[in-house]
């Protein structure tokens, strides 16, 4: 879906294993997330999707295997997690993890990012006045302010209504193309995975059991092959659709 400007890896994982007590929740995971591409990770609840994301984000340290990340990754969750006592602008600058940038420069960068995510007049707004879609866009701006090469998304559109979800998905793709980001998208939504991802990985009981490269030109959702890609993923998930 994305126009790949570079095949530089944003993240490379080899032989990743992780256990909680005696239960091994990740069983030798291998994956590469390239800059300019979206990789979707699907699977049933408890399959290990969020655990992989937490490892890549540096939030889970005790594991074996090799994990190489280009720069500092950024994370956005299903819940925007905005601080209600800070303005929208200050919420975005809160995501800056660099000390070599002045406060005024940070504010300028945050304001520019809000314009980029289609919220140009919201600097002084308060989080509680925002719609769900607007809050999610602020969360995206906050994730981008440190100029990451790897963006980790954990069900980012799950709480949005259908129309707002489509708008947010299109914004994500434009952002990936403009910034040449590598993205790992954790989702339960098979249609979303096909609409957004260059590669889809199925995780089952801590292991990647299937992988799919999505090659659909133009508007994916209206393309005849969209249904066949979706059916393939549903078959892997052992989900039957009504006749």
Swiss-Prot record:
Alphabetical list of Gene3D superfamilies matching this protein: P-loop containing nucleotide triphosphate hydrolases (3.40.50.300)
The protein's enzyme class: translocase
Stretches assigned to the ABC transporter domain: 11-230
EC number: 7.6.2.14
GO CC terms: plasma membrane
Domain of life assignment: Bacteria
Quaternary assembly: The complex is composed of two ATP-binding proteins (SsuB), two transmembrane proteins (SsuC) and a solute-binding protein (SsuA).
Family membership noted in the UniProt record: Belongs to the ABC transporter superfamily. Aliphatic sulfonates importer (TC 3.A.1.17.2) family.
Protein name, per record: Aliphatic sulfonates import ATP-binding protein SsuB
């Amino acid at each position: 879906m994305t126009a790949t400007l570079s095949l530089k890896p944003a993240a490379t994982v080899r032989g990743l294993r992780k256990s909680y007590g005696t239960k091994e929740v990740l069983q030798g995971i291998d994956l590469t997330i390239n800059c300019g591409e979206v990789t979707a990770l699907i699977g049933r609840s408890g399959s290990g999707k969020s655990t992989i994301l937490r490892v890549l984000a540096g939030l889970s340290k005790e594991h074996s295997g090799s994990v190489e990340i280009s720069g500092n990754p950024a994370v956005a969750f299903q819940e925007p997690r905005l601080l209600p006592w800070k303005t929208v602008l200050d919420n975005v600058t809160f995501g800056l993890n660099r000390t070599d940038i002045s406060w005024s420069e940070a504010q300028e960068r945050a304001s520019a990012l809000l314009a980029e995510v289609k919220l140009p007049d919201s600097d002084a707004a308060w989080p509680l006045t925002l719609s769900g879609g607007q809050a999610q866009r602020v969360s995206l701006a906050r994730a981008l302010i440190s100029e990451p090469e790897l963006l980790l998304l954990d069900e980012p559109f799950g709480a949005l209504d259908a129309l707002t979800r489509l708008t947010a998905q299109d914004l994500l793709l434009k952002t990936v193309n403009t910034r040449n980001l590598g993205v790992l998208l954790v989702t339960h939504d098979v249609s979303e995975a096909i609409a957004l991802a260059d590669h889809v990985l199925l995780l089952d009981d801590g292991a990647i059991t299937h992988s799919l490269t999505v090659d659909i030109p133009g508007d994916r959702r209206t393309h005849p092959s969209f249904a066949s890609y979706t059916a393939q993923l549903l078959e892997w998930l052992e989900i039957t659709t009504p006749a």
